[in-house]
């Protein structure tokens, strides 16, 4: 399932990406463009904006959230679409741009990541769009804990 979050749902977009869902997020996008792109790419529009109901063509692709809190919004989306996030898909997308991350052999990141990170981490991933390397640092541990605490699995 693919999503398109409107410009007020940046935190929800990051959470969906964290769980491995293909989720677009564009700031300053016109409603017509948001709807057009969602229809063209068969994406569900996630929004709190009741004005989007005026686009009859988007009716089946629109889910209006009731909460304004990101984790509650995430829970709404998972429930509505009966999604069961699989741990193998967690942290497989760039949280910034949504690109699928590419596994990279450790030897290829030497001198491209901080020395301490290179010494302490074994797995690395690369975002070809952002040109950045990622690894499972303490932020990943903290996000996994939050996912577990929120019963999102």
Residue ranges and their predicted role:
Residues 111-124:
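Short linker/helix segments within small regulatory modules
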Residues 99-103, 135:
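Short functional micro-motifs and their immediate structural scaffolds
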Residues 1-89:
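Long, charged N-terminal interaction/targeting segments
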Residues 92-93, 105:
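Short, glycine-/small-residue-rich phosphate/pyrophosphate-handling segment
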Residues 152-153:
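Surface-exposed, charge/polar-rich loops and edge strands
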Residues 106-112, 139-149:
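Short cysteine/histidine-rich zinc-coordinating motifs and their immediately flanking basic loops
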Residues 94-97, 127-130:
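Short cysteine-rich clusters marking metal-coordination/redox-active sites
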């Amino acid at each position: 399932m693919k999503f398109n979050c409107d410009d007020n749902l940046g935190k929800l977009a990051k959470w969906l990406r964290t769980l491995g869902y293909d989720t677009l997020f564009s700031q300053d996008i016109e409603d017509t463009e948001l709807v057009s792109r969602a229809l063209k790419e068969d994406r569900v529009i996630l929004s709190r904006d009741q004005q989007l109901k005026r686009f009859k063509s988007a009716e089946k692709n629109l889910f209006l959230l009731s909460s304004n809190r990101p984790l509650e919004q995430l829970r709404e989306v998972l429930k509505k679409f009966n999604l069961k996030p699989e741990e193998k898909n967690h942290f497989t997308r760039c949280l910034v741009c949504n690109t699928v991350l590419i596994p990279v052999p450790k030897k290829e990141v030497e001198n491209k990541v901080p020395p301490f990170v290179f010494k302490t981490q074994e797995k690395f991933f690369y975002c070809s769009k952002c040109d950045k390397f990622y690894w499972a640092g303490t932020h990943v541990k903290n996000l996994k804990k939050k996912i577990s605490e929120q019963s999102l699995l």
